[in-house]
Amino acid sequence: MNRTSPLPAFRFNAAVAGFLAALLIPLTAEAQSGSWKPSEQIKTYAISGNSGIELYRSIGERGPQAGVQAVAHTTFKLTWRREYRPQADGACVLATARPNLTIIYTWPKAPGKLPPDVAASWQRFIAGVEKHERVHGEHILDMVRKIEAYSVGLRAEDDPKCQKVRAVLQQRLKELSDEQRQRGRDFDRQELTDGGAVHQLILALVNGP
């Protein structure tokens, strides 16, 4: 008989630090070149158990809160260095926009000593969890690249104090943020539905050794 239990849900929780902030920080030569790379941080939380079902129950007790109890989640911190340049004709141009992005992954860490068959089952499970969360990370990175592409060269006429161009940018940031969040929700729904990749991972762990 299959052993099942209530399943904590995977949830994507986008924690944003300074996402809409327009930071007027002097730009270095590296920043002006447009080259940048995201940083990555991996957090784990300890769980206990000597079988798949015990490990999963521990996840339910200790997992991160991301709106609901979660198995894992992906968050990020994003700030910007931007340079707005008033033009001689009264317009304003956003000349440079450099992101500082950190993608933060959180997932469970099993005990170091597990029975061999349980350890093998766990490794398959956690590898699938990481694969799932890294797709969310790619969604975040894609959003930031879209923001960067939209930002650089953005121009507003009759804007000597660079207020109009900021307002236009803020509206687009909101649209791209909403798009990314919906993309994450859609992906979770696909993966967690009956027969989905994450659903299968959970069942294999719970019903395994």
Where are these regions (language model features)?
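N-terminal secretory signal peptides that target proteins for export/translocation
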Residues: 1-10
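Bacterial N-terminal signal peptides
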Residues: 13-26
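Sec/Tat signal peptide C-region and signal peptidase I cleavage site
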Residues: 27-31
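Metalloprotease/metallohydrolase-associated module, dominated by Zn2+-dependent proteases
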Residues: 34-113, 157-209
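Post-HEXXH active-site segment of zinc metalloproteases
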Residues: 113-124, 140-173
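Active-site recognition of the HExxH zinc-binding catalytic motif
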Residues: 128-140
